[in-house]
Amino acid sequence: MNPSESNVKPPLWLLAELTYRCPLQCPYCSNPLDFAQQEKELSTAQWIEVFKQARAMGAVQIGFSGGEPLVRKDLPELIRSARELGFYTNLITSGIGLTQKKIDAFAEAGLDHIQISFQASDETLNAALAGSQKAFQQKLEMARAVKAHGYPMVLNFVLHRHNIDQLDRIIELCIELEADDVELATCQFYGWAQLNREGLLPTRDQLVRAEAVVHRYREKMAASGNLANLLFVTPDYYEERPKGCMGGWGAIFLSVTPEGMALPCHSARQLPIRFPSVLEHSLQDIWFNSFGFNRYRGFDWMPEPCRSCDEKEKDFGGCRCQAFMLTGNADNADPVCSKSEHHGTILAAREQANCTNIQVNQLRFRNRANSERVNSQLIFKG
């Protein structure tokens, strides 16, 4: 496919997964299960070349992610380079390893936005989920420091069955920290979250209660002005139609892994597709011409019931990674869809959520030992 003859638009959003290294062990991490086998990382110069190519194609926003991007000592240089190229720059961090000195350096380099994640609203549960006794107080301190520096206060909480019932306390913490934007993102089941799904998926009753809490606080905050934006993301496991994943395959979003693999979404490396490397191909060639990025573009690839569905232009057939994880074939309709012949797997997961008694300490945490343990069990190693 020649780009000039294609109706494919260039990417707008670049996710730079700088590293898989991380001081925390969250059991819902979206990093690949075999991250312990993926130790190579692009150099500073290689990342900057990726930024230049993405910007030349028209990408406008970049997210620095991981792992924990703060472990990269060259982060200020990467931020500066991206900003000088004209990117809107966003740091996605746990806050562990962040210091006032680093905040100053990032601001001087031109960083536009910092998002800090929390595991819970109290120190005990936060420590249990993160695998760190000191994480909660560090997060509080750095959240306040980010706010004091003049950055928008942007917080992220991943919700699941073990913390969703404290949602009122989570929102109260956000108000206390004077948050401007809060993302209450119910667990999306990829990577380590999929491995731990039975112990993480909330029940429908929990979600109903949570939605009521969010609604109540939205009304309260609309009157008081305490919080500019409260985003509540529910799990698609309780929907009857799939999400339009990533705005369509290879349509808006481009992710580059620590070692340079280019992906149309950050979970796609688990698929039985050999995705190209930025060390071997230009981003232009990867985006427009590679097999991996064209594999699920458009609608021609779709089997039934997606091919004849009048909703296909809305959901694009759903998530290819979810179809692969739950059916073994990424071509299948996303099982979330009630039209899918595999929808029973979703119904079974909902029922399982009502019966499980898995506790936090029984979850499989994202650490090197567990990564090496599950690596041999993977269906496909990207």
From Swiss-Prot:
[4Fe-4S] cluster binds at C22, C26, C29. Keywords: 4Fe-4S, Iron, Iron-sulfur, Metal-binding, Oxidoreductase, PQQ biosynthesis, S-adenosyl-L-methionine. Pathway: Cofactor biosynthesis; pyrroloquinoline quinone biosynthesis. Signal peptide: none annotated. Residues 8-223 form the Radical SAM core domain. HAMAP family: PqqE (MF_00660). Interacts with PqqD. The interaction is necessary for activity of PqqE. It comes from Erwinia tasmaniensis (strain DSM 17950 / CFBP 7177 / CIP 109463 / NCPPB 4357 / Et1/99). One of its GO terms (molecular function) is 4 iron, 4 sulfur cluster binding. This is PqqA peptide cyclase. The gene is pqqE. It holds the Pfam family Radical_SAM. Belongs to the radical SAM superfamily. PqqE family. It catalyses: [PQQ precursor protein] + S-adenosyl-L-methionine = E-Y cross-linked-[PQQ precursor protein] + 5'-deoxyadenosine + L-methionine + H(+). Its cofactor is [4Fe-4S] cluster. SMART domains: Elp3 (SM00729). Binds 1 [4Fe-4S] cluster. The cluster is coordinated with 3 cysteines and an exchangeable S-adenosyl-L-methionine. One of its GO terms (biological process) is pyrroloquinoline quinone biosynthetic process. Disulfide bonds: none annotated. Its EC number is 1.21.98.4. Catalyzes the cross-linking of a glutamate residue and a tyrosine residue in the PqqA protein as part of the biosynthesis of pyrroloquinoline quinone (PQQ). It comes from the Bacteria.
